[in-house]
UniProtKB/Swiss-Prot annotation:
Keyword Magnesium included in the entry's annotation: yes
A GO molecular function held by the record: magnesium ion transmembrane transporter activity
Alphabetized InterPro entries for the sequence: Mg_trans_NIPA
Topology, Cytoplasmic side: 1-46, 89-98, 147-166, 213-231, 287-344
Organism: Arabidopsis thaliana (Mouse-ear cress)
Transmembrane segments: 47-67, 68-88, 99-119, 126-146, 167-187, 192-212, 232-252, 266-286
Protein task: Acts as a Mg(2+) transporter. Can also transport other divalent cations such as Fe(2+), Sr(2+), Ba(2+), Mn(2+) and Co(2+) but to a much less extent than Mg(2+).
Entry annotated with the keyword Nucleotidyltransferase: no
Classification via Gene3D superfamilies: 1.10.3730.20
Annotated localization: Cell membrane; Early endosome
Topology in membrane: Multi-pass membrane protein
Disulfide feature: none
Protein name, UniProt field: Probable magnesium transporter NIPA9
Amino acid sequence: MWESICLTLAATAGNNIGKVLQKKGTIILPPLSLKLKVLRAYAENKPWALGFLMDIVGALLMLRALSLAPVSVVQPVSGCGLAILSVFSHFYLKEVMNVFDWIGITVAGIGTIGVGAGGEEQEASLISVFQLLWLALVVAILFVLLNAWLHIFKRQRREQELGEYEVVEEIIYGLESGILFGMASVVSKMGFVFVEQGFSTMFIPMCISISICCSGTGFFYQTRGLKHGRAIVVSTCAAVASIVTGVVAGMFALGEKLPTSPSGRLLLLLGWLLIMLGVVLLVTSSRLIRHLPRSFRRSRQTSLERGFNIRRTTSHTPKDTNPSAVIQAATLHHLLSSPSKDKD
């Protein structure tokens, strides 16, 4: 179990850090196209090439983790990638982090330990075709309802000539993308389960292809939400929906079960909750910090910087203690998902 958790952490770290490096490399690169000159420029850019390689390795490690452990364990642990990205951005990109960022990282880390301590090795159970069809039907109906609800709010916004997105629209885009991300992990795991039950190995590439389609569609919905909506709402809903979908669908469609011992069951459930809480804190930290007294914000920031030996330049004067003056590490991951924001 711990091997699969370590693989998941390494995979999600590779995916998230790889995207940061690719983002850093594209600053001086032209828009990506199929022209040979452009492709050569991307390949010769060391940050982008290294980020792309880390992203690919992360995807392969995630597939390995899914082949060893239940989706109900892998998917929640993958949410800790945001915590790893925050630490990387803090030390490598020199981004300032507030007290809620560190609390979120700590809580997510404790949740990961809980999942590892409570999780149990499980034997592959028979996959019911009826359950798979029922799951596909439920997801399809859910998307029809969400899109119908979205269409209603869009029409009302146009009739009232409102320029900004309603919060319901942001929530819907976040839920749709998160559900698809969770289903992508479930479908990938399904291929390995089919092979374990004696089916053809062709099920693995077939399920992985379907998983890629789910992830791509999820990024499409997330990008639409991030383009006009607030990243804090879209990203929070996507993160929570991804974890919940992976857990519920894994147990329903793949026959995954909770640990048999009461203590293991408690640790696993507590780990799930702590990981989700940590992710929510990381995403909402820039908003939460604004509700603290200014004096407390300044004192906490000073103590954290002293504890972690942050090198402050002369530009980081007290006027920059306002969290809106810097890019928060927790929101950086979600900004990368929007191609429309590559050009500033």
